Structures are given as C-alpha cells and as structure tokens.
C-alpha cells in the first residue's frame, strides 16, 4: 500500500521526503525538518516541550500542563532534564532516520558535540542496523534503506539505550 501511495503522489508532483510526509519540491515542512535533524526548539505555553543544545550538553524542558500552574510559574519550566550520553544515540537516530535522504554525518557532531566514535555504543549499533539491511552509512550521511523505512520502529529500536 505504501508503495502505491508513494507512486501515485509522485505522479502528482509530491515526493516522499520523510517516512510519513510528501511535498512538492521546496515545500517540505521546515518545522518538522528541524525535529528530524535534531534541531533545537523552545517550548512556549502550558504543557509545551523544548530542547536546547549547549556546547557540552542537551537540555529537555517541559512546562506545567495545567494553565493555572503555568501562569503561577510565570512560564518557567516545570521540569528540566539533561539528555544522557547513552540516550543521545537513540534520540538522534529516532528522528534522523525518518528522513528518506537521511541526515549528514556531520550533523551528529554539530548537534551532540562529540565524534561518532566517542559515543559508547553508536558504532556498534550502526553496524547492527547495517548488517540487518535497515540502514546504510554513506561517506556523507546516515540513511534508512527502503526496508528500514518500512520497518522504522525496528530500526529505531536498535538504538535504544
């Protein structure tokens, strides 16, 4: 079914750029592309989530869900947590592997502040995903294979901490 949908949409000028998104050339959703490339975002408003990267850490924020509690806190985060090193590989790949074209390998260092080989498990898990035919590591990018996109949950699970 997915193949048929992709073919029909392509005939209409809509190309698949993400596991569940299609767009005309140059019309991809920049908002979602920011998430898929592990970009930062501010959580503004009751119940909002945010992600902020610093040179040596990544911080997740959650605002109070109840509007009264949010207003009482004057918009301050109700919860902040640092993304641990073992979670980084999963969080990065959870999003990046959704993109049909994959993500530039340099984006890993740019967003995490570490080389691929510095992560305790990433190279091992990349190898596992490749050996199962679910992804490829090209000279310039990580990319899910067609099978990897079909079995995206299985591919993402390989990177669980």
Task: Go through each PLM region and give its residues.
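C-terminal scaffold of the Radical SAM
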Residues: 1-114
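Short amphipathic alpha-helical interaction segments
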Residues: 115-130
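Short, amphipathic alpha-helical interaction segments positioned at domain boundaries
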Residues: 147-161
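A short, conserved structural fragment
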Residues: 130-140
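Minor-groove-contacting beta-hairpin "wing" of winged helix-turn-helix DNA-binding domains
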Residues: 141-146
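Non-catalytic, well-ordered alpha-helical scaffold segments
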Residues: 87-94, 123, 149, 153
